[in-house]
Amino acid sequence: MLIEEIFSSKGKVKILRVLSEREELNISAIVKKTGLNHSTINTHLKKLCELGIIEEKKFGRIRIFRLRKEDPRGFAILNLFNTFKGVEKIER
């Protein structure tokens, strides 16, 4: 897997950023926080799950997603967004 696959679209980056800020989110919360439509989010979430970057849990009809921080790639993504969050605060 190439890093380009993970960061191949602004939509995926928005989803990963939101998931790095929260422990777990359902699709409705991701839609609200990213401004992306439900269909686009579903497509990106499916791909990110296939890549092993995020994990899906199902509770009946509810689907919850989280960044897999125990995976080295997920941990690196979390650190990347945390680093940029710190830089953004300094630049303000």
Show which residues each predicted segment covers:
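Key DNA-contact positions within bacterial/archaeal DNA-binding proteins
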Residues: S39
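A short, conserved structural fragment
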Residues: C49-F59
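Short alpha-helical segments that sit at the start of domains
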Residues: M1-K14
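Short, Lys/Arg-rich nucleic-acid/phosphate-binding segment
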Residues: K58-I64, E70
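Short capping segments at the starts of secondary-structure elements
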Residues: R22-N26
